Amino acid sequence: MEEFQVYLELNRSRRHDFLYPLIFREYIYALAHDHGLNKSMIFLENQGYGNKFSSLIVKRLIIRMDQQNHLIISANDSNQNPFFGHKKNLYSQMISAGFAVIVEIPFSLRLVSYSQGEEVAKSHNLQSIHSIFPFLEDKFSHLNYVLDVLIPYPIHLEILVQALRYWVKDASSLHLLRFSLYEYCNLKSFITPKKSISIFNPRLFFFLYNSHACEYESIFLFLRNQSSHLRSTSSGVFLERIYFYGKIDYLVEVFSNDFQNNLWLFKDPFTHFIRYQGKAILASKDTSLLMNKWKYYFVDLWQYYFYMWSQSGRFRINQLSKYSLDFLGYLSSVRLNPSVVRSQMLENSFIIDNAMKKLDTRIPIISLIGSLSKAKFCNTLGHPISKPTWADSSDSDIIDRFVRICRNLSHYHSGSSKKKSLYRIKYILRFSCVKTLARKHKSTVRAFLKRLGSEFLEEFFTETEEEHFFSLIFPRVFFTSRKLYRGRIWYLDIICINALVNHE
């Protein structure tokens, strides 16, 4: 945040959200370059212009924009526009990268003012993406139905631009954004294919998409709060009771006539909504009929108010006790864990059957093996094969690559309740590594293992850094019984691993 305060001397622009002059400042493109140091910035890897960031190209771009009198033109006349010349793609990509930094300034200034102690309007409805993990652990097992939603994309680029009008009250900046979009993007292929999105600056695209998603989410949250007829007091203090929700149903059924005014203490009226990338889930304790109503609410809201075409096939209503939810790279479901308790009372004994709901998170082994098969680590049946493209590397590099992949998968799927599928993935990677080394040394797997021994591959099953960290915190008894390894451990950085989340 300090870099914005140092470089961005907005003065009047700060009060009126007038951001258009910033596109003529060189430090904006320097900030865009700094944002992309660890990621592949498009104009840094542009073919034909070198891979280095050139301040001379930025100066030429600013001079051309400053001298251009008719910058905003229609998309049909873009081919005759002398503004970009033979470097049209490069300049367009640089403008979109700089504009991605500019549109984030109003939001960054709010964070700066909040750090200085100023009052900032807060939203009590929206939470961080990291709240998914406590939701899965605490509340997911107490829900009945889930609505799995594939969020549609806007059918026109103008819808994305209009979403910014409430945040950026600067007509010139919005016109520049339209010009940048229409200059080098085809309207029919920009939104849906991933390769078309790669042409456009990803940072700006996701900012526009999230701004648009914020609009219909605010309306949905208003409808959700209005649909709750009971008081929205949180029941989080009761979640530690094992059979709390079972007691709720009993109390509501038996004492509803006598304690009508106190039922809000026991009911949880909220419907939980989670959005991640292009997917969303709506989970609730309601019946399937009410979930079906929410489905048509979504369809009407998107089609008639946001002009996004959505088919009913993009919605799936599943009962958590019978179906698994494919979300965040896990197959999550709620299973009944039966338990039998024998109670002795004087001379009589009773057998009580209890069924406790428990969260079950499993690894999608079929899709994960399919991903390994596409990467040439195994065949379609899951049998390990050699990796011939890595055979030219040294033995240590080959082992390090396989171990790194294995540990990343273990790190991501540490939240799984069943580790047997993870052991199978480790087996595939382990013997794929052995076959690759044997192929390099022109030997068989049996002869290679007999000559070197199998101890050098124990790195696949040795203690990771995370497990070593937990061994220093938790008592040693947990590790002698290996209970900690069987339990779920959620790491907050797994939401950044898009290759596993979008494995489909």
From Swiss-Prot:
Its main location: plastid. Keywords: Chloroplast, mRNA processing, Plastid, RNA-binding, tRNA processing. One of its GO terms (molecular function) is RNA binding. The keyword NAD does not apply. GO terms for biological process: mRNA processing; RNA splicing; tRNA processing. It is found in: Plastid, Chloroplast. The keyword Flavoprotein does not apply. GO terms for cellular component: chloroplast. Belongs to the intron maturase 2 family. MatK subfamily. Usually encoded in the trnK tRNA gene intron. Probably assists in splicing its own and other chloroplast group II introns. This is Maturase K. The lineage of its organism: Eukaryota, Viridiplantae, Streptophyta, Embryophyta, Tracheophyta. The gene is matK.
